[in-house]
UniProtKB/Swiss-Prot annotation:
Gene3D superfamilies the UniProt entry points to: 1.10.1040.50, 2-enoyl-CoA Hydratase, Chain A, domain 1, NAD(P)-binding Rossmann-like Domain
Cellular compartments per GO CC: cytoplasm
Organism this protein belongs to: Vibrio cholerae serotype O1 (strain ATCC 39541 / Classical Ogawa 395 / O395)
Site (Important for catalytic activity): E119, E141
Keywords: Cytoplasm, Fatty acid metabolism, Isomerase, Lipid degradation, Lipid metabolism, Lyase, Multifunctional enzyme, NAD, Oxidoreductase
Annotated compartments: Cytoplasm
Renumbered residue ranges of the record's region Enoyl-CoA hydratase: 1-191
Domain of life: Bacteria
Designated name of the protein: Fatty acid oxidation complex subunit alpha
Length: 708
């Protein structure tokens, strides 16, 4: 066969067929519609030699991946539901031909086996995977606002049972090898070195027979194989899905309906319905927005933020053993695989940071993600003290001390005195201008802002903030480090609030205005949850800390003007020691680590009588419009480099609803004329803070959009 083909078929002397997958010119194997002709030639050869073949082994020639999924770019070419349905049907037919082969087929899996890759493997009789860390199996289509469209919704429940299949497909979670074996997704997990040998031996052990129908556990039979049991499962799943998605993600409901339809009407009807619903989802606004995030994330992986080669980073120093410092040290060791030296003014601070890391690693050990030896190996990469011992080896030092300008300037001086001349100093400030922190530095070209979000091990965004004389190499180095830490970095201009806090502040201020107008706290939070935010603004203030808000807002008012002046609630709350969760009381009451309910006494403190006057949409738009306005100002002032960066920063930094694609894509969807119209209406009703900025007015007048 042609070596330029993605699928290469060969035969060994024992009459086994081997189908190797190697998409030419690509790092990852993906399935593409253009491969259909190749696969038809493969099936023709296999059927022609059917009497001589004992079995077929499918494997990848890529060193670290099986099939990462279908090429999502194919969907962008679909102009109609009909075209998208034809695409899904083509994939289904190809995998059905694989399932219908008269001899057994085994998929030998190493590396990611996701989406269409797993659907191909599910069409095989058997599956063997490596136990390597790189091996992951899953159906993540729901993350793109889709459902598995090549048989996944029909084959997975029949293989492992309805309950575990619903969990995998609705969440899009990816399984490690041992978990996949435990659930029955694969038949064996083995060392990489023997993968192909074991795959072939499995066919021999099975007597070269096709797989018999899987026998599911008795509980699964009672629940999923009876009409009443199925109804109970799907009713419960629909209820949980609605609670989680609040109706904003149509793919989740479609997944439930397609799986239920297939179990009740049979495999053939289920596949037809799967293709139909898949196609409908492809054309939805939600899926298009989620796919735009996927493409943007992929693009950003190649973006170093500057035209320079990043310097190697073999060791990192962290100043401050608090929550931020501990989290930064964790992602550096766990994700970036780089050793860390922690410095704190007190031994207790260092011990707290080490203990924080140990607890996170131990959770992974308890979940069988790490062995005890691996946990110890990770902890051995962490050390610390109250002095600067070891900092002469650090290539990057990340500062996470208190938000005090003089203290941070002293940290710069200390590192310049105790580290290499080439050491980069990255400050994790959330509000102080980077040029001020660098103002007394001997080597200002090595200084850059690196703003993480709390908790660091969970929040995916980091803002990289160069000041006027930060070198391109410094920018490229910290962008590369942040990406290795598992973060999505965006490069933003050095100004008050940077980007994320600057667009968050007007949103939070308006939420406070709505509250002070008498809207009940729970109503206000629920309105933004329904809109698609992960938490409501009042809950967010409690989580971040009222004291943090009280520090940031005056800086923004001083630097950017009176539109950042919110209602005077911070001082009143802080006088009553209401800092939020950290102090055990804020707008909500807390018991241990759990939020309980609205603390009704806060109304009396703020001299309010709660009374609902606005509907949910009115509340949401009041909070959202100032954020959209400020995002446009940030773009026009060069705070962010593009609408893409602005959207990714909002989604990954503050949880802007992903199904809307970010503030800029959302404005494009609404139409800028409509956005201006809404802002003008709010200006008349609530004041000048809603007046649309010049950039919005100009674009709306010219009929422009933020994206082509």
């Amino acid at each position: 066969m042609d070596n330029n083909n993605a699928f290469q078929l060969s035969f060994d002397e024992q009459h086994y067929a081997w189908l190797a997958i190697d998409v030419p010119g690509e790092k990852m194997n993906t399935l593409q519609a253009a491969f259909a002709e190749e696969m038809q030639a493969v099936f023709a050869t296999l059927n022609e030699k059917r009497g001589q073949i004992k079995g077929l082994i499918i494997h990848s020639l890529k060193p670290d991946n099986f099939i990462a999924g279908a090429d999502v770019r194919m969907l962008e070419a679909c102009q109609s539901v009909h075209e998208a349905q034809a695409l899904a049907s083509q994939g289904q037919q190809m995998f059905q031909q694989l399932a219908d082969l008269p001899f057994p087929v085994v998929a030998a899996i190493h590396g990611p086996c996701l989406g269409g890759g797993l659907e191909l493997a599910l069409a095989c009789d058997y599956r063997v995977c490596t136990e390597d860390e790189v091996t992951r199996l899953g159906l993540p289509e729901v993350m793109l606002g889709l459902l598995p469209g090549s048989g996944g919704t029909q084959r997975l429940p029949r293989l492992i049972g309805l309950l575990p299949a619903l969990d995998l497909i609705l969440t899009g979670k990816q399984l490690r090898a041992k978990k996949a074996k435990k659930l029955g997704v694969v038949d064996a997990c083995v060392p990489h070195s023997v993968l192909l040998d074991v795959a072939k031996r499995l066919l021999e052990e099975k007597g070269h027979k096709k797989r018999a129908q899987v026998t599911l556990p008795i509980k699964e039979k009672l629940l999923a194989n009876t009409g009443l049991g199925r109804k109970l499962i799907f009713d419960q799943a629909a209820k949980k899905t609605q609670q989680k998605t609040r109706g904003n993600y149509p793919a989740a409901q479609a997944i439930l309906e397609v799986i239920q339809y297939g179990l009740e009407k049979g495999m053939h009807a289920g596949l037809e319905y799967e293709a139909k619903r898949f196609a409908e989802l492809v054309m939805t606004r939600e899926s298009k927005a989620l796919r735009s995030i996927f493409f943007a994330t992929t693009e950003m992986k190649k973006d170093l933020g500057a035209d320079a080669k990043p310097a190697p980073v073999a060791a990192v120093g962290v100043l401050g053993g608090g929550l931020m410092g501990a989290g930064i040290s964790h992602v550096t060791v766990a994700k970036a695989k780089t050793s860390v030296r922690i410095k704190d003014v007190a031994n207790d601070g260092v011990l707290n940071a080490l203990n924080y890391n140990y607890k996170l690693f131990d959770k992974q050990r308890q979940r069988k993600i790490l062995t005890k030896a691996q946990l110890q190996a990770q902890m051995s990469q962490l050390s610390g003290g109250t002095g600067f011992v070891g900092f002469d080896r650090c290539d990057v030092v990340i500062e996470a001390v208190f938000e005090d300008l003089k203290l941070k300037q002293q940290m710069v001086a200390d590192i310049e005195a105790n580290a290499k001349p080439t050491t980069i100093f990255a400050t994790n400030t959330s509000s102080l201008p980077i040029h001020q922190i660098a103002s007394q530095a001997q080597r200002p070209q090595n200084i850059v802002g690196l703003h993480y979000f709390s908790p660091v091990e969970k929040m995916p965004l980091v803002e990289v903030i160069p000041h006027a004389t930060t070198s391109d190499e410094t920018i490229a180095t910290v962008v590369t480090l942040a990406r290795k830490q598992g973060k999505t970095p965006i490069v933003v201009k050095d100004c008050a609030g940077f980007y994320v806090n600057r667009i968050l502040a007007p949103y939070m201020n308006e939420a406070a205005q709505v509250l002070m107008a008498g809207e009940p706290i729970e109503k206000l939070d629920a309105a933004l949850l329904d809109f698609g935010f992960p938490v409501g603004p009042i809950t967010l203030l409690d989580e971040v800390g009222v004291d943090i808000g009280a520090k940031i807002m005056p800086i923004l008012v001083k630097e950017l003007g009176p539109r950042f002046q919110g209602p005077d609630v911070f001082d009143v709350l802080l006088k009553d020691n209401r800092k939020g969760r950290k102090s055990g009381k804020g707008f909500y009451t807390y018991k241990g680590s759990k939020k309980k309910e609205v603390d009704k006494s806060v109304y009396k403190l703020l001299k309010l009588t709660p009374e609902s006057k606005l509907n949910d949409k009115e509340i949401a738009m009041r909070c959202l419009l100032p954020m959209l306005n400020e995002a446009v100002r940030c773009l026009d002032e060069g705070i962010i480099r593009s609408a893409r960066d602005g959207d990714m920063g909002a989604i990954f930094g503050i949880g802007f609803p992903p199904f809307l694609g970010g503030p800029f894509r959302y404005m494009d969807t609404l139409g800028l004329t409509k956005v201006v119209e809404m802002m003008n209406q709010h200006t008349e009703k609530y004041g000048e803070r809603f007046a649309p900025c010049d950039g919005l007015l100009t674009r709306a007048g010219l009929g422009e959009k933020f994206y082509p």
